[in-house]
């Protein structure tokens, strides 16, 4: 299948207005001085909420209190799958935060690393780019409630090129960071490069 290597962005007046409003609020918040300990506490609480909410979207049954307890628990204890999922997400947020401090470039390897962190504890088959389906079958995204096929993503053979296209866009575009975040999320869930963890990986990478 021939892949078209083009990412186009059309901004409406409404989108531009919203971006301007967000920039104004961000500037106001950035001018507020607070002790480092307060900043760190707010940052950690924000990452906890993200870890809970992102996994909740995927059907994780933990309450926010349970998710926070799992994150704060001794890392050497045994965790149930739902607990491991929120811990994995929190760890991935921390790793990406450190990469951002080092100004590491957005890359395909980074996407793969994040998905591996998201799927830590899962079967090896779920880690890494998805491969070919059995003859006569197509990989599809199914509705978790009805079981009906909702979307058929690109063929596995096209995934590397599509990811490279996304990486090139992120590293060369002059678009506003909010637009880049939206494109990263949209492209990753559309490409659906993995057997599992696509949504969580997309949300993590969109914040980088």
Segments predicted by a language model, with ranges:
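FIC/Doc superfamily catalytic core
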Residues: 1-208
């Amino acid at each position: 299948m021939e892949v078209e290597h083009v990412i186009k962005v059309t901004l409406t007046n409404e989108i531009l207005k919203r971006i301007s409003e967000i920039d104004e609020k961000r500037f106001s918040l950035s001018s507020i001085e607070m002790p480092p300990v307060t900043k760190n506490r707010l940052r950690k609480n924000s990452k906890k909420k993200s870890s809970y909410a992102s996994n909740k979207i995927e059907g994780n049954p933990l309450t926010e209190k349970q998710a926070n307890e799992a994150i704060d628990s001794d890392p050497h204890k045994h965790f149930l799958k739902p607990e491991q999922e929120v811990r994995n997400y929190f760890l991935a947020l921390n790793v990406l935060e450190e990469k951002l401090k080092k100004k590491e470039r957005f890359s395909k390897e980074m996407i793969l690393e994040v998905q591996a962190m998201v799927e830590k504890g899962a079967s090896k088959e779920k880690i890494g780019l998805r491969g070919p389906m059995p003859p006569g079958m197509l990989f599809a995204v199914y509705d978790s409630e009805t079981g009906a096929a909702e979307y058929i993503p690109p063929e596995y053979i096209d995934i590397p090129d599509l990811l490279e296209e996304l990486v090139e866009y992120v590293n060369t575009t002059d678009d506003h960071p909010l637009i880049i975040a939206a494109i990263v999320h949209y492209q990753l869930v559309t490409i659906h490069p993995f057997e599992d963890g696509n949504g969580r990986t997309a949300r993590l990478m969109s914040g980088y």
